[in-house]
């Protein structure tokens, strides 16, 4: 990610992230309450240094059901303390006694029932509590924090999306060139996600570099904030009014997650995608649906304090946005 453009400038400080699991706390918010009855057993878990898939498998084994009958809203960081819901499909069966469930690093917080499966993506967002160790209080860092609070940060996909050392992206490029054949369903999904995340990042970086991240262009596709509704900024629109709405954070400029029937909105998008036709072809071949994503993201309820250990941050992000993309604007990280 080093080559991606910063919204501010490259940070001047270096800090430590995830020295301890307690330095990175994530609390999931589904956006709905459990129904209290139904064929699914819903289990809220606090995990410390645990992989989501590993915990899901252990819960399924304890309940005596296949792992495929487990559901969760999303994968969480391993080296962290995370809270999230799992659901187990158990129609007509009693709720297991999870007081008997034992797994290092896992604490059962709540058990109830629900009438629908918790699916990947059925997530409103996440609350974060992050400690950046060795970050020093100074004028530059305070300005960066205030700028993020006011203007947001680039909504980049970060390293987690691309796998260790960018492995998922490398494999996607090899797949697109016909060098490998990927049969494993999970790997196919990871590689496709990495490929279109890379295109998105490059488009966002180019707009910021060209000073176009706060300027609405003809044919831009805009998103109503807090929704998944989009509309074109065609020549009939009042661009002065659109710019006012953008400044008021009522609307957001988007960039594409390439796929079938992708709508290329601006010259910036066209230029980047034209250089990666093999990836676009792969998306069509795999029938990936195209989507849009805001190029900038606003951290909600952002607050901070300097303590002897470093800088402590708390904020909320909608599903799909990365806390490490925000941190990237503040400090260089040594993990």
UniProtKB/Swiss-Prot annotation:
InterPro entries found in the cross-reference section: PsdUridine_synth_cat_dom_sf, PsdUridine_synth_TruD, PsdUridine_synth_TruD_CS, PsdUridine_synth_TruD_insert, TruD_catalytic, TruD_insert_sf, TruD_pseudoU_synthase
SUPFAM superfamilies: Pseudouridine synthase (SSF55120)
Enzyme Commission number(s): 5.4.99.27
Keyword Iron: no
Catalysed reactions, semicolon-separated: uridine(13) in tRNA = pseudouridine(13) in tRNA
Keyword field contains Isomerase: yes
Residues annotated as catalytic: 77 (nucleophile)
Any one GO CC term of the record: cytosol
BP-aspect Gene Ontology terms: tRNA pseudouridine synthesis
One GO molecular-function entry: RNA binding
Keyword vocabulary terms for this entry: Isomerase, tRNA processing
All copies of domain TRUD, residue ranges: 152-308
Similarity-based family: Belongs to the pseudouridine synthase TruD family.
PANTHER family assigned: TRNA PSEUDOURIDINE SYNTHASE D
Function field: Responsible for synthesis of pseudouridine from uracil-13 in transfer RNAs.
NCBIfam families recorded: PRK00984.1-4 (NF002155), tRNA_TruD_broad (TIGR00094)
The name this protein goes by in its record: tRNA pseudouridine synthase D
Originating organism: Histophilus somni (strain 129Pt)
